[in-house]
């Protein structure tokens, strides 16, 4: 009986050791926020403080982790939508970094006045992308098409030709570049 317990303890200890050493403690690679901020400044916002861009990027990275949205995709959406201009206003009356419409803001229970606040805008945009990811089962092209054209249009269109969709392709190319 004692020998059986001893063997069981040794085997259990051995299994635990194998599991311990076989599991790699993989940490996600954290982006170089300073390099990203410099790149954004050079491409889109000359004269905009790198420190502020860096802070926005760190905030964005945290949001992406919280809502399980790809950080590079969000950076690309912001680049395509507003060129990182916090005061951007489209002809369709979409506002801020992620070009949030008043309808999307009200759907996400935020006032339209907040849309020029970059932190509110990023939060709403990432939340919206997260919701679209869930709605379209992670189909990134459909998610981006719906972000740009609205989910109603995507749902009515059925099969979409993404090869000809310049918005979707721009965002994906920009995200892949980083």
Predicted regions mapped to residue ranges:
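N-terminal Sec-pathway targeting helices
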Residues: 1-12
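Catalytic and substrate-binding regions of cell-wall glycan-acting enzymes that process beta-1,4-linked
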Residues: 29-36, 104-107, 138-178
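Surface-exposed patches in mature extracellular/periplasmic domains of secreted proteins
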Residues: 72-76, 88, 137-146
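Substrate-binding/active-site groove segments that recognize
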Residues: 91-110, 125, 171
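Short glycine/serine- and small hydrophobic-enriched flexible loop segments
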Residues: 62, 79, 102, 106, ...
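Export/targeting segments at the very N-terminus of extracytoplasmic proteins
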Residues: 24-84
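A short, structured beta-strand-centered segment in the mid-to-C-terminal lobe
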Residues: 113-121
């Amino acid at each position: 009986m004692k020998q059986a317990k001893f063997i069981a303890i040794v085997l259990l200890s051995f299994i635990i050791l194998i599991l311990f050493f076989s599991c790699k403690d993989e940490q996600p690679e954290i982006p170089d926020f300073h390099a990203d901020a410099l790149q954004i400044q050079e491409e889109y916002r000359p004269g905009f403080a790198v420190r502020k861009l860096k802070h926005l990027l760190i905030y964005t990275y945290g949001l992406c982790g919280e809502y399980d949205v790809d950080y590079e995709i969000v950076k690309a959406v912001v680049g395509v939508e507003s060129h990182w201009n916090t005061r951007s206003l489209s002809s369709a009356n979409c506002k801020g970094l992620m070009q949030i419409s008043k309808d999307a803001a009200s759907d996400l229970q935020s006032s339209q006045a907040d849309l020029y606040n970059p932190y509110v805008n990023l939060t709403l945009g990432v939340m919206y992308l997260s919701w679209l990811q869930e709605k379209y089962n992670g189909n990134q092209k459909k998610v981006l098409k719906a972000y740009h054209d609205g989910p109603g249009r995507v749902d009515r269109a059925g099969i979409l030709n993404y090869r000809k969709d310049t918005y979707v392709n721009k965002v994906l190319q920009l995200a892949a570049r980083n």
